[in-house]
């Protein structure tokens, strides 16, 4: 005798989604590769910014400190406000 609350075994309906072994199509692979490249560039920029923040003066050449000093002391500028 079967209990009224149990269900009789019925076959499951066929799945309407993509097959389990289906891979990505060409457009999805292209977008995935593009996003991956953007993430790599973002990580490289973040590493560079952190390195500059930790030691800002090591990346700056010493000549840039003295090139424009004489012109500024004389009151000459590269541009003039009219």
Swiss-Prot record:
It is found in: Membrane. Its main location: membrane. Neuron specific. GO terms for cellular component: membrane. It comes from the Eukaryota. The chain crosses the membrane at residues 30-50. Keywords: Membrane, Transmembrane, Transmembrane helix. Residues 1-20 are annotated as: Disordered. May mediate extracellular or intracellular signaling of cortical neurons during forebrain development. Belongs to the cortexin family. This is Cortexin-1. The gene is Ctxn1.
């Amino acid at each position: 005798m079967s209990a009224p609350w149990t269900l009789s075994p019925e076959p499951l309906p066929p799945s309407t989604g993509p097959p389990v072994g289906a891979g990505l199509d060409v457009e999805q692979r292209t977008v995935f590769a593009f996003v991956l490249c953007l993430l790599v560039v973002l990580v490289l920029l973040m590493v560079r910014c952190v390195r500059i923040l930790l030691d800002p003066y090591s990346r700056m050449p010493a000549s840039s400190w003295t090139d424009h000093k004489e012109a500024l002391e004389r009151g000459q500028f590269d541009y003039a406000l009219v």
